[in-house]
């Protein structure tokens, strides 16, 4: 193994491999291999969802959390029969629960489809139209900003500096006459 050449068991000569540590995608180095296996990429399309906590970012805490007590309340001194109050509570709660389930069954998947398309369009436009347009504008505006900077430093700075020197020697004194 001298001069950058390797000899295999059959006596054939070959050049030094480009990377002796192994394949750049599957390293032979054990420590390197452990680092690669530790870094797992999580795909947003295959992640598991939490069926218990369905609002982990608390988007709807102050808007949708409406209970019976938030909508219907009887002030002190004006109470209906206890049975009516219990039946009203049960009716409200069960109706809200099942009607929400019915609406989400009928409209949930179509609305998810519509919002998925909408946000896909927004993402597409942002990635392929908005950001390139802004970058293009910033590149084009640099030329104008350089010309403007030269104009300001050449004409405006000396003019305003001269005006400042003229007015810097003006002294105002006030006197009170009684």
Swiss-Prot record:
Annotated segments matching region Interacts with SPRY1, SPRY2, and SPRY4: 149-160
Residues the record lists as Phosphotyrosine modifications: 6, 14, 25
Region (Interaction with CAVIN3): 82-94
Tissues/organs with expression: Adipose tissue, lung, heart, skeletal muscle, stomach, small bowel, kidney, spleen and testis (at protein level).
Cross-link (Glycyl lysine isopeptide (Lys-Gly) (interchain with G-Cter in ubiquitin)): 5, 26, 30, 39, 47, 57
Location in the cell: Golgi apparatus membrane; Cell membrane; Membrane, Caveola; Membrane raft
Post-translational modification: The N-terminus of both isoforms are blocked.
Intramembrane region(s): 105-125
A cellular component term, taken from the record's GO annotations: endosome
Disulfide bonding pattern of the chain: none
Chief location of this protein within or outside the cell: Golgi
Region Interacts with SPRY1, SPRY2, SPRY3 and SPRY4: start-end pairs: 131-142, 167-178
Region of interest (Required for homooligomerization), residue spans: 2-94
Modified-residue entries (N6-acetyllysine), positions: 5
Assembly behavior: Homooligomer. Interacts (via the N-terminus) with DPP4; the interaction is direct. Forms a stable heterooligomeric complex with CAV2 that targets to lipid rafts and drives caveolae formation. Interacts with BMX, BTK, CTNNB1, CDH1, GLIPR2, JUP, NOSTRIN, SNAP25 and STX1A. Interacts with SLC7A9. Interacts with TGFBR1. Interacts with CTNNB1, CDH1 and JUP. Interacts with PACSIN2; this interaction induces membrane tubulation. Interacts with CAVIN3 (via leucine-zipper domain) in a cholesterol-sensitive manner. Interacts with EHD2 in a cholesterol-dependent manner. Interacts with CAVIN1.
Protein family: Belongs to the caveolin family.
Protein name: Caveolin-1
Source organism: Mus musculus
Lineage: Eukaryota, Metazoa, Chordata, Craniata, Vertebrata
């Amino acid at each position: 193994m001298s001069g950058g050449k390797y000899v295999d068991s059959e006596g054939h000569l070959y050049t030094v491999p480009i990377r002796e540590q192994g394949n750049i995608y599957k390293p032979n180095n054990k420590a390197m291999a452990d680092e690669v296996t530790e870094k797992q990429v999580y795909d947003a399309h295959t992640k598991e969802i939490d069926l218990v906590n369905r609002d982990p970012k608390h988007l709807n805490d102050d808007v949708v959390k409406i209970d019976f007590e938030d909508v219907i309340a009887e002030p002190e001194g004006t109470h209906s029969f206890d049975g009516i109050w219990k039946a009203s509570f049960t009716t409200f709660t069960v109706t809200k629960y099942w009607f929400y389930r019915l609406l989400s069954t009928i409209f949930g998947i179509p609305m998810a489809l519509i919002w998925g398309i909408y946000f896909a369009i927004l993402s597409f436009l942002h990635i392929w139209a908005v950001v390139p347009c802004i970058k293009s504008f910033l590149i084009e505006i640099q030329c104008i900003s350089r010309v403007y900077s030269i104009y300001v430093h050449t004409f405006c700075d000396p003019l305003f500096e001269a005006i400042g020197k003229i007015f810097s020697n003006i002294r105002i004194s006030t006197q009170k006459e009684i």
